[in-house]
């Protein structure tokens, strides 16, 4: 099955797991494009940061879920399955939605939370150019509860005050009945309070404030043939986890003087994907295509020891 729940991670965010596998093995796509960064950027219980960029509900047309391994097509991070969120596009008139919510707890030991999101989409040039803008914010108060029972773990969901922001826009150009070009930008900012060491010890590698930042730019081209559809896109995204610090026990002796300095955790990915979708009979679909990825990651622990930046380039061709 598919589980969407707030786990016992340090941020209290939502995680999606499929068929009992950890959330790190569920790949999240929006309009077929990868969104989150590697779990190596969010180590030690911060993986839920990668799900803080979902579009507003009004922007979603449908959600496609593939349960089971899709590693051949998407890589090892799709061993559990794939969730593809399809957004609304090419509206023939302007549509807008604004939503606000407030969750009030009965006990003042639990933090209240509020949400606000908006979405608007419509034509700029009739039957040719359309624009979509979207955004959301979530504010959560801290919780003074540290344990649910005498035997429970000290860490629980919703442990600390946080502010999450997401803003994005998409431009579609229908050049002809068969050709569509699109451009999409998205930015996410998350902030978590750690003044009392709720997320990690202030003397053990954590700053007083932890932040997660993600920027994404995508451009694509879709062409419709009589026998199928050709889809291509170029996607660049950069994610950074700020607020971690270097500690002596992970540094070489001659690097102990760096203890207490900020630990850089930053990743960037460039992905070029192109595929052809064509029906086979009345109930089958054939997918043929290829993908190229260029990735780099910086970890302050490795940088302090060797100065090395991890880099990887890979390509693949596939048929399904």
Model regions: which residues?
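Extracytoplasmic beta-strand/coil segments of soluble accessory domains associated
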Residues: 1-37, 61-62
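Transmembrane beta-barrel architecture of outer-membrane proteins
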Residues: 13, 78-80, 101, 113-117, ...
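Short acidic/polar hinge/loop motifs at secondary-structure boundaries
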Residues: 17, 33-67, 118
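Outer-membrane beta-barrel translocator/receptor signature
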Residues: 43-46, 58-61, 72-84, 88-146, ...
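Extracytoplasmic loops and strand-loop junctions of Gram-negative outer membrane beta-barrel proteins
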Residues: 44-48, 65-66, 99-103, 149-155, ...
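Outer-membrane beta-barrel pore domains and translocons
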Residues: 68, 86, 99-105, 134-138, ...
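Transmembrane beta-barrel wall of Gram-negative outer-membrane proteins
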Residues: 109-141, 147-191, 213-220, 279-283
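Face-selective signature of the C-terminal outer-membrane beta-barrel domain
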Residues: 172-190, 210-320
């Amino acid at each position: 099955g598919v589980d969407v729940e707030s786990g016992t991670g340090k941020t209290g965010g939502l995680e999606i797991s499929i068929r009992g596998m950890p959330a790190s093995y569920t790949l999240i796509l929006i309009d077929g494009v990868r969104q989150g960064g590697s779990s190596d950027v969010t180590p030690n219980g911060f993986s839920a940061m990668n799900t803080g960029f979902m579009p507003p509900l009004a922007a979603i047309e449908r959600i496609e879920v593939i349960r089971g391994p899709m590693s051949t097509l998407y890589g090892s991070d799709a061993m559990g399955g794939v969730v593809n969120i399809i957004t609304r596009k090419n509206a023939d008139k302007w549509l807008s939605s604004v939503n606000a919510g407030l969750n009030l707890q009965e006990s003042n030991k639990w933090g209240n939370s509020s949400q606000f999101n908006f979405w608007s989409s419509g034509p700029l040039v009739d039957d040719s150019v359309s624009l979509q803008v979207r955004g959301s914010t979530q504010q959560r108060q801290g919780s003074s509860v540290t344990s649910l029972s005498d035997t429970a773990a000290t860490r629980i969901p919703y442990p600390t005050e946080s502010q999450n922001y997401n803003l994005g826009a998409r431009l579609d150009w229908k050049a002809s009945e068969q050709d569509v070009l699109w451009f999409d930008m998205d930015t996410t900012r998350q902030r978590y309070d750690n003044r009392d060491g709720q997320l990690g010890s202030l003397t053990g590698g954590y700053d007083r404030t932890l932040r997660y930042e993600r920027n994404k730019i995508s451009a694509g081209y879709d062409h419709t043939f009589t026998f199928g559809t050709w889809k291509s896109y170029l996607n660049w995204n950069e994610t950074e986890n700020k607020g971690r610090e270097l500690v002596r026990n992970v540094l070489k002796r001659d690097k102990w003087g760096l203890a207490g300095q900020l630990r850089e955790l930053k990743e960037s990915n460039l992905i070029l994907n192109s595929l052809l979708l064509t029906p086979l009979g009345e109930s089958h679909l054939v997918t043929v295509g290829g993908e190229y990825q260029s990735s780099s990651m910086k970890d302050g622990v490795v940088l302090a020891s060797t100065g090395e930046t991890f880099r990887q380039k890979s390509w693949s061709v596939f048929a399904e």
